[in-house]
Amino acid sequence: MIRIGHGFDVHKFGGVGPLTIGGEKIDYPQGFLAHSDGDVAIHALCDAILGALAMGDIGKHFPDTASEYENIDSRILLRHVVSLAKEQGYVLGNGDVTIVAQAPKMLPHIQAMRSNLASDLNCELSQINVKATTTEKLGFEGRKEGISSHAVVIMNKESMSKTNA
């Protein structure tokens, strides 16, 4: 069986940088206001995986009221979500992440983000895409108040993924 999921996340800028996006530290004067490290790309990806498997959302699994998740590296959260999917017999077919940001520029960091995500997802680099866009200076992203991210995933039943490999 194939399952499709979509995720979305947004965080406002605040405090001091760097930013962490896609598991990559990006030099920027501001950081994110968030309970965890605020990695919008990974949070959207976690939500997409959880949504595909009808397992709720990131807030259900990692509530912002729980002190153990304060300032946590979101890659740890992603690896946990991947293990939950594996317990249900699912693996990533492919994933596509879109980062919406006026600044900083993402292009210099995209390949490192893809490598980080592929490692945490236990998949080939060709199974995960990361891209970035601006809002042409419109909205909160355009005013450089924060960053948002969307993610879409296809999750395959593990036995299906082995026969198609």
Swiss-Prot record:
It comes from the Bacteria. Binds 1 divalent metal cation per subunit. Its cofactor is a divalent metal cation. The keyword Cytoplasm does not apply. One of its GO terms (biological process) is isopentenyl diphosphate biosynthetic process, methylerythritol 4-phosphate pathway. Its EC number is 4.6.1.12. A divalent metal cation binds at D9, H11, H43. InterPro entries: MECDP_synthase (IPR003526), MECDP_synthase_CS (IPR020555), MECDP_synthase_sf (IPR036571). The keyword Nucleotidyltransferase does not apply. Keywords: Isoprene biosynthesis, Lyase, Metal-binding. It catalyses: 4-CDP-2-C-methyl-D-erythritol 2-phosphate = 2-C-methyl-D-erythritol 2,4-cyclic diphosphate + CMP. The record marks H35, T134 as: Transition state stabilizer. Pathway: Isoprenoid biosynthesis; isopentenyl diphosphate biosynthesis via DXP pathway; isopentenyl diphosphate from 1-deoxy-D-xylulose 5-phosphate: step 4/6. 4-CDP-2-C-methyl-D-erythritol 2-phosphate binds at residues 9-11, 35-36, 57-59, 101-107, 133-136, 140, 143. Pfam families: YgbB. One of its GO terms (molecular function) is metal ion binding. Involved in the biosynthesis of isopentenyl diphosphate (IPP) and dimethylallyl diphosphate (DMAPP), two major building blocks of isoprenoid compounds. Catalyzes the conversion of 4-diphosphocytidyl-2-C-methyl-D-erythritol 2-phosphate (CDP-ME2P) to 2-C-methyl-D-erythritol 2,4-cyclodiphosphate (ME-CPP) with a corresponding release of cytidine 5-monophosphate (CMP). Homotrimer. Belongs to the IspF family. This is 2-C-methyl-D-erythritol 2,4-cyclodiphosphate synthase.
